[in-house]
Design a protein with these regions (language model features):
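Macrodomain-like recognition of ADP-ribose-binding/processing modules
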Residues: 1-180, 186-205
């Protein structure tokens, strides 16, 4: 079962929690800071991995300790100062989906990967996470950013065809219509005339 909700990730009863991290060993903000305070041994393990340059975008890893704590540290950005990229989140989700069975994950709770300090939009991240994980045979709780409209927590919203740009951030590129290309070429030729006046709004409207 897959469900999106608003609430406290740490109150989830899921077997495995997902933490968003960078690749330089800093957990200074957001949900990562809370993970650091709650699970200091996990942070030391994470810091050791980053010191060895063993953590890469697109390759989350499972941390498990003797007490039964299971945390997936999921890199959403290279440096903590950098924005998150949707393409990196997608690669990480593919990796997580491929390893979930091997990691013996029976239930999963995760934050809105790359949103907040990462700068990504829930309207892109939520549907992407649903697309990549909803078919897994486990219970999944996806915690949306506070203030997310209820309609954007529904399966109808999450399963709708997205307009994601996996080159990074923002919406899908819209191809230029042929008439726009012709118009741009006319404007370019006008501007190239040696004694041409600048093309103002009136002339532009007449050409259009």
């Amino acid at each position: 079962m897959f469900r999106a909700l608003i609430g406290d990730l740490f109150e989830s009863q899921a077997q495995t929690l997902v933490n968003t991290v960078n690749c330089v060993g800093v957990m200074g903000k957001g949900v990562a800071e809370q993970f650091k305070r709650r699970f200091p041994e996990m942070f030391e393990d994470y810091k050791s991995r980053t010191d060895r340059k063993a953590l890469r975008l697109g390759e989350p890893y499972l941390y498990r300790d003797s007490s039964g704590v299971q945390i997936v540290n999921f890199p959403t950005k290279d440096h903590w100062r950098s924005p998150s990229r949707l393409a990196d989140v997608e690669r990480g989700l593919d990796y997580l989906a491929a390893h979930a069975a091997g990691w013996e994950i029976t239930s999963l709770a995760l934050p809105p990967l790359g949103c907040g300090n990462g700068g990504l939009e829930w309207s892109e991240v939520g549907p992407l996470i649903y697309q990549k994980l909803h078919d897994l045979p486990i219970d999944i709780e996806l915690f949306a950013p506070y203030g997310t409209p209820k309609q954007q927590l529904t399966e109808e919203f999450l399963s709708a065809p997205s307009q994601m740009s996996l080159e990074g951030r923002g919406r899908k590129h819209v191809p230029l219509r042929p008439e726009w290309v012709v118009l741009m070429e006319v404007l370019r030729e006008l501007e190239a005339q040696p004694y041409a006046s600048p093309v103002g709004r009136t002339i532009f409207q007449k050409i259009s």
